[in-house]
């Protein structure tokens, strides 16, 4: 398509299906859930054209809500296999980067259509079974958000390529957005299928090749994502999938001289480790690696005395307990004025009592299980501490049971000390801690909200008075990269609320935005002169 100036289809957010009783999508999804539950998938490493299974290094993928149930078996990559995957990336990069950008874009637009069609129940079922998401949480993540990433990233890439410098008479200036020279290392979390697939595909769209390391606990849905990309026409080697011991994979990737970037979502501690290692290895790299990370959060809801109780309670419940609080944006701490607390407390307890926890294939459940035993133990540790502490009291929940699945009841803690650990530390589970502040000391409460935690990912305020809304927004300016007014702090939509935070929450490069894509290209400025100068002398030199 050398003789065409194309325009990509206008992006649109994928409509969310309801899965209400009697709908066609519910019937299809139930059938697919049964099919996948009865099948143990074999998930290989994907290295170029090779699908590699190593029976000596096999590991199981289990269902969090039924951990005796093996969903899949995967091969853990050796150091040699990681090296081979990187070499395959480097070999594929030149041809991939040389394609017209429209040809690269077409792969991801095709992938979006596949997800909207036949792969919708497949990737949703894999996300429900493998990550214990309800049908709604799987739909808004694995299908809708991932489709949105593909469509909007293409739109933003078109804007990048279209942005060109001015040209003076007698010359033509151009700007070329080249893919990074080398390979990008994509390190993925368990909690969002869409993020796990966007981390490698956003750089790939811009002409990069990518070493993709999904989390083993979300590997079933990541494998579906890989199959979608292959069917959409992604050439072998552009994205290679490796999984296994993170230390083995990262040690090879971070020591490689062709490391061009890291696209990361996960814990602050792991990202800090990656950053430090890159710093220690800086002299061996051919270029300065781009480091893009979305990390931890201790996300807040701050209520003013003018807030409406009903919407505040709903925001707290949904913000804290959807997907078991395992969203990096989940409401984990709240500051409630004393004047509202009796009504808010009553509403929280009454609403939490209605929440059903269990197998997400039972569509009446609001919550599933937390992801694994390690997460269960960590969250339970915070709950046990609150049960014994003089600085906190549990006002709802606190029950934990890992006998069948890793189930934790939604838990609400009232902190008597605003510096109590569950008001400051990331828990990543269905635990909401509330501090009740004196209405007359709202400025002190705002300072606590801003300074108590090192994170600054998401936050929300609830108030009716417009002057107060402006005041709170200013006071909490740097407390959150995504800030919500009279809404829960979760549920960012691609193309509407670009997502990311600062401080210890990451580099704030906003996934699903033009700013993120700019990190995966290196611009070359080209100046062509139509009237070359033939005399080295300047006019001022004339006698």
Each language-model region and where it sits:
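ALDH superfamily catalytic-core signature
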Residues: 228-233, 255-256, 261, 269-418, ...
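Rossmann-like NAD(P) dinucleotide-binding subdomain of oxidoreductase/dehydrogenase enzymes
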Residues: 128, 147, 157-311, 504, ...
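Short linear capping/connector segments at secondary-structure termini
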Residues: 126-133, 165-169, 362-368
């Amino acid at each position: 398509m050398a003789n065409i100036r194309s325009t990509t289809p206008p992006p649109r957010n994928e409509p969310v299906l309801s899965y209400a009783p009697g709908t066609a999508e519910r019937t299809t999804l139930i059938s697919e859930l049964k099919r996948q539950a009865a099948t143990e998938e074999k998930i290989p490493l994907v290295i170029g054209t090779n699908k590699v299974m190593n029976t000596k290094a096999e590991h199981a993928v289990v269902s969090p809500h039924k951990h005796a149930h093996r969903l899949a078996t995967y091969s853990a990559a050796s150091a040699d296999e990681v090296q081979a995957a990187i070499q395959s990336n480097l070999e594929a990069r030149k041809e991939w980067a040389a394609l017209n950008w429209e040809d690269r874009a077409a792969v991801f637009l095709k992938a979006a259509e596949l997800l909207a069609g036949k792969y919708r129940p497949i990737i949703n079922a894999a996300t429900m079974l493998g990550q214990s998401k309800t049908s709604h949480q799987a739909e808004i993540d694995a299908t809708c958000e991932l489709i949105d990433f593909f469509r909007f990233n293409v739109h933003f890439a078109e804007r990048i390529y279209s942005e060109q410098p001015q040209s003076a008479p007698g010359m033509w200036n151009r700007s070329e957005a080249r893919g990074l020279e080398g390979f990008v290392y994509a390190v993925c979390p368990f909690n969002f299928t869409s993020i796990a697939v966007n981390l490698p595909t956003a750089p790939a769209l811009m002409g990069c090749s990518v070493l993709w390391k999904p989390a083993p606990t979300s590997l079933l849905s990541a494998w579906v994502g890989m199959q979608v990309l292959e069917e959409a026409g992604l050439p072998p080697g552009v994205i290679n999938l490796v999984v296994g011991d993170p230390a083995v994979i990262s040690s090879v990737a971070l020591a490689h001289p062709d490391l061009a970037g890291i696209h990361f979502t996960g814990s602050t501690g792991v990202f800090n480790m990656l950053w430090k290692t890159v710093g220690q290895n800086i002299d061996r790299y051919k270029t300065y690696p781009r480091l893009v990370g979305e990390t931890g959060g201790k996300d807040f809801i701050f209520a003013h005395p003018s807030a409406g109780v009903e919407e505040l309670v709903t925001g707290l419940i949904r913000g804290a307990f959807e997907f078991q609080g395992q969203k990096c944006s989940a409401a984990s701490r709240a500051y409630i004025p004393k004047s509202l607390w009796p009504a808010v407390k009553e509403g929280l307890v009454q609403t939490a009592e209605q929440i059903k926890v269990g197998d997400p294939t039972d569509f009446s459940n609001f919550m599933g299980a937390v992801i694994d035993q390690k997460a269960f133990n960590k969250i339970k540790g915070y709950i046990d501490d609150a049960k014994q502490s003089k600085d906190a009291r549990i006002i709802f929940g606190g029950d934990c049971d890992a006998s069948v699945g890793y189930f934790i009841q939604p838990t609400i803690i009232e902190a008597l000390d605003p510096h109590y650990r569950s008001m400051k530390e990331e828990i990543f589970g269905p635990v909401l801690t509330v501090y009740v502040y004196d209405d007359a000391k709202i400025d002190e409460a705002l300072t606590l909200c801003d300074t108590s935690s090192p994170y600054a990912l998401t936050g929300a305020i609830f108030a009716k008075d417009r002057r107060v809304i402006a005041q709170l927004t200013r006071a909490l300016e740097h407390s959150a990269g995504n800030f919500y007014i009279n809404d829960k702090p979760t549920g960012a939509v691609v193309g509407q609320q670009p997502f990311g935070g600062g401080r210890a929450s990451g580099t704030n490069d906003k996934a699903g935005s033009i700013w993120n894509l700019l990190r995966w290209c290196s611009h070359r400025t080209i100046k062509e002169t139509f009237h070359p100068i033939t005399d080295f002398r300047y006019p001022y030199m004339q006698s």
